[in-house]
Amino acid sequence: MMTEPNGPALDALDGLSVGDALGAQFFVPETARSHFTGRTDPPGPWPWTDDTEMACSVYAAQRERGTIDTFDLTHAFALRHDFDRGYGPAANRMLRLIREGGDAKALAAELFDGQGSYGNGAAMRVAPLGAAYADDLDEVVRLAARTAVITHTHPQAVDGAIAVAVAAAIAVRARTGTMTPETFLGEVVFHTPIGAVRDGVIEAIALLAEPDPLVAAKVLGNGSRTSAADTVPYALRCAARHLTDYRAAVWEAIAPGGDMDTVAAITGGVVASCTGTRGIPAEWMAAREPLPGWAFPEPGGVTGGRGRADMLVPRSHPVPDVEWTDEQWQRLRAGRHTDTLDHRWAVHTHEGSVRICRPGGGHPVWEVAVTRIRGGRRPVSAVVETSHHRWSVLPTDPHGLTTLSWILRTAAAGERSALRP
């Protein structure tokens, strides 16, 4: 069950974004020389980077629906992609192609000669999700993995996202009691799949007593390779050592150089999950560039689909010539259409696809994949149930395409109209 959207999840987003924005200041050599040694604050404002932009999309998605719709989140990443926020070349290309109608799953899977990205991008954005589902660590693991593979399909990247999300969830739980750094990281190890990230967190436990961050980073990494395995263990070590001291944790995250904005974002998101926004220095919050307004949609403004069993015999179906404005798409997503459709059809969305069922049946007759276009959405593919054991439509039946087109137009318009055939 998701926590209050203005509670730990927002705390994690604030902590992540402040760490990201402060860390990014130290890529400027003059700032690094003049401010780091004395730990004095660089002059504001501090712009945030791609770390925060993507984390805002994660936060907005779960705030709006009360869960994560990976189709919508994928296209939110692409729609809000700002080239100047510091995305890597592979991410820039992939998000641009998704925005132009490319297959998101195929684009993510083909990165790095088909291995998928093993970078730290999935880990850097996930703390608000972990904080939101702190009551259910199994759900944290499941959702962290689902949101990771949108852009990062390599197991190391997925494991990095899981480790950070679990750490944020455990940090929320630590608000009501005390937790040693060893216990904190031990819980992360327990829930992280076997692999390089988990091994790194185990090494981080062994280095908790090491006072010199440069020594620890030499073993664990500092994000300079931009891989999850080179980033997550050190970031979580900083969080574990200073779980109730946001300032100390973030300064330690920045200390060894490397991918300073991302390491500080991960550390800051986890620590603020424990301390709350009140634990973040007020002057740092004031210096951080304000978060975008789109990150704060109306809570619960869109409800999820009802869920259903899969089709028995799906077949490709002609794609209706239909386009929806953004307003019409929101009406479709709200899922209240049976009265408009003469109580013969129920329409809802699930992970961005439109599903059309008989009321009370739950089994889809059609499922229509949708992509964003300028000013709205349009269908890009459709499948239909052809099993004789259920209400079925033959793909070659022209009446089927007519009916599907009528359903999609009428449900989006919200006004009853006659089905002529």
Where are each of the predicted segments found?
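Negatively charged, low-complexity tracts enriched in Asp/Glu with abundant Ser/Thr
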Residues: 296-351
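A structural detector for beta-sheet-dominated domains
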Residues: 348-350, 371, 385
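Structured, active/binding-site neighborhoods that engage oxygen-rich ligands
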Residues: 1-299
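Hydrophobic residues embedded in beta-strands of well-ordered beta-sheets
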Residues: 352-354, 377-378
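Canonical SH2 domain fold
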Residues: 353-372
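Polybasic, proline/glycine-rich intrinsically disordered low-complexity segments
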Residues: 377-421
